[in-house]
């Protein structure tokens, strides 16, 4: 376990924030008349001698004198809080001619910014403090004491906030305003997005000790690969990591478009700007030297790569060489900190021809670029220890008679209810499209069409590749659907939740009403996805967060948790494919396996050797879930061709 708990200690601080700050002094008319930009500053919440809530701004260095601002009647604009930006407007003082002061916060770690804003809101609501003192009271009063850092938020303050429910005028996401010079539109928007309030966690989500160790290593600037079986919280941890890092200089990528969309990033190929990566190295370097692409490489300080198992070794080596060439640094990966996540025992790289794939850990540059490796071992997705043990055996390519018996017994499971049928996971995307189209056509009634609104329709193909929603969604009464975005975790409306369309609004947009397996019935409104195209261009798609769910591909299910699953393993063609499919299920009771063949359970021996080496060298745990049974387990390994 890594030491250096202090590296991550700041993650849990709610009253302090380090970021870029621009201080604007406004005229009485609201126009900026003086501006000071601070590349790095520390904001602290505290109180003065009269218990007034104050904000202290401290610039680095001995010359940076702290400034304190009273927070009475402060207004906070949080439309871009998820991107690490916010604006705090402080009202004018009683001094004649004085104007308001505006603090523009940027490059904040998004999670820390959210907690900072939540603390501010709770403190303002619980104890707004006395009004401003008169000049006479200030002269006759005690000498001002030093700034006192605010106390942590207390349970009583949370209860008071919930009980009073004062109108929240401080934390508001403002609607998008039309650009200057643009002609006003007379057409009503097809997909009006409801104004959402800033999402702030009611409590501090706790990381497990092994997850905290990964975060500490990242915050210390170490390049790291963290791995773990399906359901160990890799995706959740990756989002926590991204929320703890400054947005500037942090690039989130993944090997596939869907995985990239889940973490709010772009594909590794789109960031690199070298096309498919099949060209010779000199040509790849030339492609990366193009102005827009080159600047992306130069600005990158931390590169996140998710689903690393699907990145081929030759591509990784080329990217490493391109990084050194473009950045003109001979350090590993050009001095970029790598934060790599994935499980090599899941889906392998896609290759053409009969040649077996070469995994990233087989690349020449892997060891020098990734000095730290940590494994997550606690499974969060499944609660049944029997099912967890079964999945761990399948992950290692072990299919004993008991594992075979348990999986074959699921063929009789009735995994759907209330008109909701199981989603069938298919090995080939063509089967998915045909199944969903056929089942939709078989339903009686009218087809309801919902077209997406794309920020750039000419780049719809890029959005199709990276968004979990399609440009056109067709639904009927009784259509099987899946939620592809978290709407309300507490109510069970999460990514992967299964449901059935039970109606459509009679008025307005005719939005679908969906009854979910968790028992909730909800009218589904449009949501927005933002992806990054080649060259850093941001694209957005506005669409219902639904997709047809009679069938979906195993590749697109990677990283998801499904309520009820039906799997056919008869056409499994890659190592790890059976394991990925089986591990999507939340429970053994929600799983039905058809035509099970023990030979479908296999893994690549090179990956087993890689993990065994890590276990010996870094104390990684890769023991069998059942040591007594391990000796008799049959290991189905793909031959190395």
Swiss-Prot record:
Ranges of biased composition (kind: Acidic residues): 624-641
DNA-binding residue intervals: 577-596
Keyword Metal-binding among UniProt keywords: no
Primary localization: nucleus
Induction per the UniProt record: Tightly cell cycle regulated and expressed in late S/G2 phase.
Source superkingdom: Eukaryota
Keyword annotations of the record: ATP-binding, DNA damage, DNA recombination, DNA repair, DNA-binding, Helicase, Hydrolase, Isomerase, Mitochondrion, Nucleotide-binding, Nucleus, Phosphoprotein
InterPro entries recorded: DNA_helicase_pif1-like_DEAD, P-loop_NTPase, Pif1-like_2B_dom, PIF1_helicase, PIF1_RRM3_pfh1
Subcellular location field: Nucleus
Region (Disordered): 173-192, 622-641
Top EC class of this enzyme: isomerase
Record-linked Pfam families: PH_LRR1 (PF25344), PIF1 (PF05970), Pif1_2B_dom (PF21530)
Keyword Endoplasmic reticulum set for record: no
Tissue: Weak ubiquitous expression.
Chain coiled-coil ranges: none
Matching Gene3D superfamilies: P-loop containing nucleotide triphosphate hydrolases (3.40.50.300)
A cellular component term, taken from the record's GO annotations: nucleus
EC number: 5.6.2.3
Function: DNA-dependent ATPase and 5'-3' DNA helicase required for the maintenance of both mitochondrial and nuclear genome stability. Efficiently unwinds G-quadruplex (G4) DNA structures and forked RNA-DNA hybrids. Resolves G4 structures, preventing replication pausing and double-strand breaks (DSBs) at G4 motifs. Involved in the maintenance of telomeric DNA. Inhibits telomere elongation, de novo telomere formation and telomere addition to DSBs via catalytic inhibition of telomerase. Reduces the processivity of telomerase by displacing active telomerase from DNA ends.
HAMAP family: PIF1
Record text on subunit structure and interactions: Monomer. Interacts with telomerase.
Comment field on protein domains: The PIF1 N-terminal (PINT) domain enhances the interaction with ssDNA through intrinsic binding activity, it also harbors DNA strand-annealing activity.
Protein name: ATP-dependent DNA helicase PIF1
Organism: Homo sapiens (Human)
Lineage of origin: Eukaryota, Metazoa, Chordata, Craniata, Vertebrata
